[in-house]
Amino acid sequence: MKITIAPYTDANATEITDLHHACVHAISPTIYSLEQQEAWAHTPPNYPYWVKRLALKKPFVAMVEANIVGFIELEENGHIDCAYTHPAYQKHGVMRELFAYTQNVAQKKGIKRLYLEASIVAKPFFEKRGFVSLSRNEIKKNGQMIVNYSMEKILS
């Protein structure tokens, strides 16, 4: 499977929005309840919100053939805001490729620190890539408490 990383275009907005929704709702309800998943990613998705968000964030997009299989957002200050892989492509190296690309871009820009808020399911991925957990957070989102972890990685 050949994974390519492409810049975001406005034509990607609906597919990325659907990917985000599918990712959140594919998490086992033993990790995040169905109510927490719905608070995190409404059904149906809020497409106008995501169109505006993605136009501002300009994520890096992972493609397999013509299909969007993942995306990651890197802000100028080193914050990674979103990092998602389509459920059908998880455990196939998509996020590994996206993260390696993102880290390379960050280093070329002179960013010294990457930081993020990782979900329970994403935390092990980032730990394997040198991130350390700074705190466990309980975030209230749409009436639900959602656990995530503030993490950082110092770049050399």
Regions found by a protein language model. Name each.
Residues 93:
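Conserved G/P- and acidic residue-centered "switch" motifs that form tight phosphate/ATP-binding loops
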Residues 126-127, 131:
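Conserved active-site tyrosine of GNAT-family acetyltransferases
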Residues 7-10, 18-88, 99-101, 121, ...:
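Acetyl-CoA-dependent GNAT
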Residues 50-52, 72, 106, 140-143:
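Short secondary-structure boundary/capping segments
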Residues 56, 79, 112, 145-147:
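Exposed loop/turn and edge beta-strand positions of beta-sandwich/beta-sheet ligand-binding modules
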Residues 106-118:
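Conserved GNAT acetyl-CoA-binding A-motif
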Residues 115-117, 132-150:
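Conserved catalytic-core motifs of GNAT/GCN5-like acyltransferases
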Residues 2-4:
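Extreme N-terminal starter segment of soluble prokaryotic enzymes
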